[in-house]
Amino acid sequence: MEELLYSALDLAAIISSMDLGCRAQANFLEQIWENERAFLWSGYRDNKRQMILDTSYWLTYFSDKPTIDAEFPMIQRDAQATGGELLTENYTSDYADLDLFFKSARLRILYGGGKDYIRLKRRTLMKRYGYKRMTPLLMEHFHRCIYFYHLQPFVRDRVECRIEDVDIDEMIIFRVI
């Protein structure tokens, strides 16, 4: 379940996608600290300063991503030259992008200042994250995320549903319960 907790990278990615100003970013992080501490990575639950510093670091990365990405091969060469090893796969999970969707959905609904729901078609959700069909493992992961983030999927007229029962082109509406 550790991979479902909010990391600084997750928070920065969500904030970047929301295109918030500096004060709005600070307010957003303050709300997360006050209300979502149970969902924060364990290293941040008692250290607000570290959470803000690490999130700010990643926000800086996203603001100048092309330049920093251009330097990545040099960092890898330096690590190899000094006998070190950079294991990028240690920082991702099989469903990292999909996890970020559910994390973002919860935070946008609760603190985005707009709608109290997120909606999209099942086809869009699957296509956006590179899936072509609902496998049992993917469904298990969907249900795990929905349960963990206290989200409930609905179809039209606020009828509760299960994602696998929704038609591929039907709109799914997620709300925090």
Predicted features by range, described:
Residues 158-177:
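C-terminal edge-of-domain segments
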Residues 14-27, 37-46:
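Charged, low-complexity interaction regions
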Residues 44-97:
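Long, low-complexity, charged/polar intrinsically disordered regions in eukaryotic proteins
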Residues 6, 15-24, 115-120:
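Short capping segments at the starts of secondary-structure elements
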Residues 36, 41-61, 126-163:
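Charge-enriched amphipathic alpha-helical scaffolds
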Residues 1-7, 89-94:
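N-terminal intrinsically disordered, low-complexity, charged/polar
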Residues 34, 112-133:
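Short glycine-rich, basic-tinged beta-strand/loop micro-motifs
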